[in-house]
């Protein structure tokens, strides 16, 4: 079993505190009508949560898979960088009236930043995967 440093847990729980509401809001917004006042309000919250969670995740060291840079960053951190780029790009697109580009970027953000990243986070050897699927970590 991997021994995680104490600040690792703080970062992971802060990441969870932002990603879980982002996932709920993102899912809700994907299935609801677009363009309403509520959509615009929730969209801003969603983007702030995604930017925050991606920024927090950059400080979480990779303990599973290859470490690509500075013995800290792994492949999953590439999704953080893409999220940090996509959030303002999607916001700028909608402010310019580029709804098709905005829609594409938001779907990309949801699939890449939430679904794919979430899948990799639950893999064996990662903290959340071990927490959910390995009863030894809970005891």
Describe the function of each predicted region.
Residues 1-139:
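Alpha-helical membrane insertion/targeting regions
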């Amino acid at each position: 079993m991997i021994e995680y440093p104490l600040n690792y847990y703080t970062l992971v729980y802060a990441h969870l505190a932002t990603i879980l509401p982002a996932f709920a809001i993102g899912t809700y917004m994907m299935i609801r009508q677009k363009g309403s006042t509520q959509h615009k309000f929730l969209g801003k919250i969603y983007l702030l949560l995604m930017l925050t969670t991606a920024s927090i995740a950059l400080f979480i060291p990779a303990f599973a898979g290859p470490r690509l840079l500075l013995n800290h960053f792994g492949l999953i951190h590439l999704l953080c960088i893409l999220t940090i780029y996509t959030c303002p790009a999607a916001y700028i697109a909608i402010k310019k009236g580029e709804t098709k580009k905005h829609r594409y970027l938001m779907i990309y953000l949801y699939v890449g930043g939430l679904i794919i990243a979430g899948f990799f986070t639950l893999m064996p050897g990662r903290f959340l995967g071990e927490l959910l699927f390995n009863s030894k970590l809970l005891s």
